[in-house]
Design a protein with these regions (language model features):
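NTP-dependent nucleotidyl-transfer catalytic core
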Residues: 1-125
């Protein structure tokens, strides 16, 4: 099954921008027959459990539901490590020396698919 997801950062209460993003992600997933996951990105030092609880309660109160348990980013490091190891073993990881500006400029260039890394540093290391 394919999934949509919403990944809030619990560094404050839910605001209108968060709600808009959550509602769009949820509606698109449900309308297209996909599952919907909630993944809390709690790695930011400003994250607080009380904000997470309030944000999730607000979303539930508005009828936004998700499939399965809430996924907590800080509790998924073993999965991330396994994914990294798999990519490394297949030779698909490499260092990128581009600055954020280089990447932003490449994204604005009139070539290639939007949002796709152009591979500038792929063969340097």
């Amino acid at each position: 099954m394919e999934y949509g997801r919403y990944a809030p950062s619990p560094s404050g209460d839910l605001h209108l921008g968060n709600l808009r993003t959550a509602l769009l992600a949820w509606a698109l997933a449900r309308r297209s027959g996909r599952g919907f996951l909630m993944r809390v990105e709690d790695m930011d030092e400003r994250s607080r459990p009380q904000f997470q609880e309030r944000q999730l309660a607000d979303l539930r109160a508005l009828g936004i539901t998700w499939d399965g348990p809430v996924q907590i980013q800080s509790q998924r490091t073993a999965g991330y490590d396994a994914a990294f190891a798999s990519l490394w073993e297949r030779g698909l990881l490499y260092e990128c020396y581009c600055t954020r500006r280089d990447l932003a400029d490449a994204a604005r260039a009139p070539h290639g698919a939007p949002g796709v890394y152009p591979g500038t540093c792929r063969d340097l290391s």
